[in-house]
Each structure stands twice: as structure tokens, then as C-alpha cells.
């Protein structure tokens, strides 16, 4: 599309009356980040900036939420404030956090799942942290997230999941 131009017709759908990708963020008493994937049955506890920065680990079920945390400022160089440790930053924030993912669409389905999941994670973190990102900002940050992951995702996939209804992109 970049070289030749073009458009994509896209429709956002629900599966069994629910969004096919869901992300929940809630406070955690301990000053750490707990990552969970319901559909994969996986969990990881993140306590250091190094563990957040480890988003490029091949095969990790938590690459997307870790990269989203980086873009939300939970990494030196991505925050306007300076903290000695992730624990110190979470203390200043007021709590740790637990991020839970649920995907009813298999990875590699060709339905833009990773882009839409990235947007969903970024939106949930924005809401939880009071970052006030609008839908356009979330979609733009999704492009950056995919570049951080070097996945080279599509340029429009996230808009399909973030914006309701039928769209010509």
C-alpha cells in the first residue's frame, strides 16, 4: 500500500457476544508487575527494568505487554521521571499491577491478532495509569510497539479492532 496505494475494508466483530481479545489491569499490593495469559495458562512476575526490557525474547507470551509497559514509561529513557528501580517507580505510582490477557483467536490466524492485542494492552495500561491516550494515540503507539518487537506488523490492523463497525482504511 505504501508504494502502490490501496485501501482495506475492515469490520470489527465480537465472538459469542464478547470482544475476542480482552485485557484487564488491576492494582497489586506488592510493588511488582504480574503478567497472566488465561488462554495460554502462563504467568510471569516482573520485578526489574531488565525483565521489562526483555520483550524481544522469542516465543514469550508476554512480549507485547512488556513492550507496552516500556511505551507507557515503565523503563528508563521512556519516562519523564527518573527512578533507581522498577520497584521505586511502582511505589511512586502507588501500587504494582496485574495485567491479564485473554485471546479467543489463535496467534498466526492472519486476523491482525497481535496488532489488536497490542492496542488493547496499550489502552488498558493507559486507562489504569491515567495516561489519557485517545484511540489515535493508542493506534500510533501500536505501530511503535511493533517496531520495537521487530515484527513489522501491518499498518492498519490495530484500527480494525480499536474502531467499531465497518471501515475503509
Task: Tell what function each PLM region has.
Residues 1-111, 123-135, 140, 163-169:
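ATP-binding N-lobe of GHMP and related small-molecule kinases
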Residues 114:
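Short, conserved phosphate/pyrophosphate- and ester-handling motifs at nucleotide-, phospho-/glycolipid
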Residues 120:
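Active-site signature of alpha/beta-hydrolase-fold catalytic machinery across serine-
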Residues 138-151, 155-156:
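Intrinsically disordered, low-complexity acidic/Ser/Thr-rich segments used as protein-protein interaction/activation
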Residues 151, 156-168:
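Acidic/serine-rich, low-complexity amphipathic helices located in mid- to C-terminal regulatory regions
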Amino acid at each position: 500500500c505504501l508504494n502502490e496505494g490501496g485501501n482495506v475494508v475492515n469490520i470489527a466483530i465480537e465472538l459469542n457476544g464478547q470482544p475476542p481479545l480482552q485485557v484487564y489491569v488491576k492494582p497489586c499490593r506488592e510493588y511488582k508487575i504480574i503478567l497472566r495469559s488465561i488462554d495460554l495458562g502462563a504467568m510471569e512476575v516482573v520485578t526489574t527494568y531488565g525483565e521489562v526490557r526483555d520483550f524481544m525474547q522469542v516465543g514469550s507470551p508476554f512480549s507485547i505487554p512488556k513492550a507496552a509497559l516500556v511505551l507507557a514509561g515503565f523503563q528508563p529513557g521512556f519516562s519523564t521521571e527518573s527512578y533507581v528501580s522498577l520497584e521505586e517507580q511502582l511505589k511512586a505510582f502507588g501500587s504494582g499491577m496485574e495485567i491479564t490477557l485473554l485471546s479467543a483467536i489463535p496467534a498466526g490466524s492472519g486476523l491482525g491478532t497481535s496488532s489488536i492485542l497490542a492496542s488493547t494492552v496499550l489502552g488498558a495500561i493507559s486507562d489504569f495509569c491515567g495516561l489519557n491516550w485517545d484511540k489515535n494515540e493508542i493506534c500510533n503507539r501500536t505501530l511503535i510497539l511493533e517496531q520495537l518487537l521487530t515484527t513489522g506488523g501491518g499498518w492498519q490492523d490495530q484500527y480494525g479492532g480499536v474502531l467499531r463497525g465497518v471501515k475503509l482504511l
